[in-house]
Amino acid sequence: MAKYDYNPKYGLENYSIFLPFETSFDAFRSTTWMQNHWYQSITASVVYVAVIFTGKKIMEKYKPFQLDTPLFVWNSFLAIFSILGFLRMTPEFVWSWSAEGNSFKYSICHSSYAQGVTGFWTEQFAMSKLFELIDTIFIVLRKRPLIFLHWYHHVTVMIYTWHAYKDHTASGRWFIWMNYGVHALMYSYYALRSLKFRLPKQMAMVVTTLQLAQMVMGVIIGVTVYRIKSSGEYCQQTWDNLGLCFGVYFTYFLLFANFFYHAYVKKNNRYTEVKKDKKEKEEPVDFEILEPKEDINANIAEPSITTRSAAARRKVQKAD
């Protein structure tokens, strides 16, 4: 269960500027609610999967919606939210491992971030995983490919985050800080993409590389916590949550590594947008819209996605 570990060196006392809703945050009320309702993340996940696949089936009868402006607004909102969360979590995060008497071990074993300013942004982080499911609604309505990596990632992140929040998992400060930072870049990238900006391939590679680094760090932290707890020392993370941690981060690493390989390393990769103008270079798409061409309606006036090799594409072009 959650352990309150308030340290007067952090929280409101560690911030020169704070917002009204941060000072009024009630950690006890928030934690109690999550302990009584965290399992609803599983219910929400089941409903989510049913809705998106039903929606995908229904959309087969309709043309894709043009949602560039709403998509830009949505991604911009999530980018700003993530930037604020990252900035507000950073002072306590740095203090947790760099202040006198603190260490990396302290930062992953003491949940002193669960109240005050960081407590508020931790709660918002957990709740945001529910609202981020809206990402998939845009994919379905725009008839973009819906891949396993996308919906699996959304579902498991939400369930794990809610489970970790109810226990005040100490290593969560690392996961939250990293995720806020990666999402700040990722959603900013998506916002620009929604405005049809031509962005260099390196930007997508940076986002994916940071996502992979996040997974590697998650596994390292999990192993460290396991060793500490196995030695009989105190570390605020339940065995159940630690098991979930290993499971989700290991599978994320495999999935994102597979995506990175096929999108940026392997020649004639599966994840390529084929441009109508042959003078334009083919460029990899982000993991939000990856899928073989067969899943796309042939009448959609958008760049298609193909799994064919370069040789196969040349044959088709000659036949035309």
From Swiss-Prot:
Membrane-spanning segments: 33-53, 67-87, 120-140, 145-165, 203-223, 242-262
Location in the cell: Membrane
Membrane topology: Multi-pass membrane protein
Keywords: Fatty acid biosynthesis, Fatty acid metabolism, Glycoprotein, Lipid biosynthesis, Lipid metabolism, Membrane, Transferase, Transmembrane, Transmembrane helix
CC per GO annotation: endoplasmic reticulum membrane
GO MF entries: fatty acid elongase activity
Main location: membrane
Reaction catalysed by this enzyme: a very-long-chain acyl-CoA + malonyl-CoA + H(+) = a very-long-chain 3-oxoacyl-CoA + CO2 + CoA
Family matches, as InterPro entries: ELO_CS, ELO_fam
A GO biological-process term: very long-chain fatty acid biosynthetic process
Glycosylated residues, chain numbering: 14
The enzyme's E.C. designation: 2.3.1.199
Family: Belongs to the ELO family.
Function: Could be implicated in synthesis of very long chain fatty acids. May be required for normally rapid growth.
Name assigned to this protein: Putative fatty acid elongase 3
